[in-house]
Amino acid sequence: MEIRRATVADALQIHALISHFANQELMLPRPLLSIYENIRDFQVAVIDGRLVGCSGLHFTWGDMAEVRSLAVDPEAGRRGIGRALVEANIAEAREHELVQIYAFTYVTDFFAKLGFRVVAHESMPRKVWMDCVNCHKLNCCDEVAMVLDLIEGVEPEPFDVSQVRVPIVNSLKR
């Protein structure tokens, strides 16, 4: 198995993989345009020349990033592909000296084995204000928030909503 940075040529396969699980409501959908726009966020797993998994590490602030769009081809499951992808995300986050990474997930046992811990959604204000405000599940989110502290004893920078340009917030200021 090879874990490598995604290229633009991988976008359609990444989209198909994510859509497979999104159609079953096991993860949020990602428009193809979003995948192209964020292709540098993605790592892919390849076995015998076939893309069998993907995971994105999306930077959400100077000290945090989200593991998102983790998907493994069901035919290639149970081979450690998801683990290898998230470990690549963790390594990249450490290279960038991030304090914390997080995921919103349905597979808490998987992330717990990698050292993530469950936290309240309310403890993730950047995620809520930057992404969740645009999600159809905003008021009924059933995903579990989990974090992995990368630097022991160091907390992420406190959140100040005035630093984020969110249409609803900006309209309230008028």
Locations of regions flagged by a protein language model:
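Short active-site oxyanion
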Residues: 1-2, 95-101
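A short beta-loop-alpha structural element at the N-terminal edge
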Residues: 2-14
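Helix-loop element at the rim of GNAT/NAT acetyltransferase active sites that forms part
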Residues: 16-29
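A conserved beta-strand-loop-helix scaffold within acyl/acetyltransferase catalytic domains
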Residues: 29-42, 46-47, 53-70
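A short, internal acetyl-CoA/4′-phosphopantetheine-binding micro-motif in the GNAT/acyltransferase core
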Residues: 70-77, 106-107
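Conserved acetyl-CoA-binding loop-helix of GNAT-fold acetyltransferases
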Residues: 78-93, 103
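Conserved active-site alpha-helix within GNAT-family acetyltransferase domains
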Residues: 99, 105-131
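C-terminal "cap" of GNAT-fold acetyltransferases
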Residues: 124-174
